[in-house]
From Swiss-Prot:
One of its GO terms (cellular component) is cytosol. GO terms for molecular function: 16S rRNA (adenine(1518)-N(6)/adenine(1519)-N(6))-dimethyltransferase activity; RNA binding. Specifically dimethylates two adjacent adenosines (A1518 and A1519) in the loop of a conserved hairpin near the 3'-end of 16S rRNA in the 30S particle. May play a critical role in biogenesis of 30S subunits. It comes from the Bacteria. This is Ribosomal RNA small subunit methyltransferase A. It is an enzyme of class 2 (transferase). Keywords: Cytoplasm, Methyltransferase, RNA-binding, rRNA processing, S-adenosyl-L-methionine, Transferase. S-adenosyl-L-methionine binds at residues 29, 31, 56, 77, 102, 128. It holds the Pfam family RrnaAD. It is found in: Cytoplasm. PROSITE patterns: RRNA_A_DIMETH, SAM_RNA_A_N6_MT. Its EC number is 2.1.1.182. Belongs to the class I-like SAM-binding methyltransferase superfamily. rRNA adenine N(6)-methyltransferase family. RsmA subfamily.
Amino acid sequence: MSKDIATPGKTTEILKKYGFLFKKSLGQNFLIDSNILTRITDTAGISKETNVIEIGPGIGALTEQLAKTANEVVAFEIDQRLLPILDDTLSAYNNIQVVHGDVLKADVEEVITQQFSKSELPLKIVANLPYYVTTPIILKLLHDNIPADSMTFMLQKEVADRISAVPSTKSYGSLTIAIQFYMEAELAFIVPKTVFMPQPNVDSAVIHLKRRKEPLAKVNDEEFFFEVTRASFAQRRKTLWNNLASKFPALKPRKDELVEGLNAIGIDLIRRGETLDIPEFAKLSNFLADFLEEK
């Protein structure tokens, strides 16, 4: 099998050989530009001293580029029809393991321990994520505290904008905070829709997430912190007070007391959630947690 998978001609040849038909339900769009693959591996910072988990290898175009540079690659593929294709296209590489399964249901830490011969090496996660499942996968990896020092994803540009957003912009929201609380986020480059087969309706972007040594702000209860941030963006055009009072009805009889307490730490309830940065949300959630516990 030729190593140059990521061209229109080679991709078409592989798909015809196996009679492969794209499943819209799985959001399958295969890259057909090897230059983009090189930029992804460069952005991810892959070396022979790193292990890589890839999610959704497709027919192996990105996988082979990762294998050329990394120590070992473990790729999660949910579509069983692609397994024999991957066996064929990646047969020249002995440092790739393909795991058939849904990464959302997988014990990723167990896979790391079992599949990598040198599991102590730094781990990087790289993926061309299906649009429909982008957010659940990223949040699972963060929630499960997978020991990856960075994650590099190609995803819908709109989602990349939301992940890398700053306060007081239309893209800034609870997803921004959920990710930037743990990771530094950089939108690396835009990927035009024309370099995919089949061609999607929108452009993509590659985003690079680097794990922070410590979360961006100190919170007393992370679960409550994220509950507060989600509530604050429930209706973007409403004030903090309206959104929080809707989520926590116990605040309503004590509004004056709450306003006074929050003003003392520099937070005005007439602001909208989109104007608060992460440290301010941390102050807000820590205060609210104590306030709601008071008799």
